[in-house]
Amino acid sequence: NRPEYFGRMLAEGLLGACIRAENADFSGLSALPKTPETRWTAAKLRCPAFDPAAFRLPAKLCRLIELTAQTWREGRTEAEWKRLIAEHGWETAHLQADLQRTDAVRQIGLRGDCVTLRQLAVTGADFPTLCGKDVGRMLHLLLVYALEHPDQNTKTQLLAAAPSLWQEENKIQD
């Protein structure tokens, strides 16, 4: 349960069935925050062939490790951090930020920036002429808009932007 020992265990041939770690460098894992999420994800990033399920880790942790590895990218801008949160959730973003030793995600949370549908200044009820999936499409368009223009996340400004965003989206769809 301590991935920081992987290097030594691999050298002794103890993990051959679980990890094919050609040239994987597990040094430095012990310097990371002492959470299972952080250390197991760092092991996955250093050895992409690593299968967390082989260690019988909880399914939720395995999914988080895999998602974080799939969406991993260093040097994100603030807008890219917001998109990551919007698309994959706070947990994945916090984990990546911890691994990259940045407080960008924490700052976004502290400011209360709009990164989820729940944080939008409008709701589906503000679009009575739309039905079903069209309501969801509109709200997602407005979320993308709010991610790019955080100062525009007011009911008045989003309702004003909605018709042109909808028209542009439907032009692309046709």
Give the ranges of each region predicted by the language model.
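Internal metal/ion-chelating core segments
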Residues: 1-13
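C-terminal subdomains that position terminal phosphate/3'-OH groups for nucleotidyl transfer/ligation
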Residues: 11-174
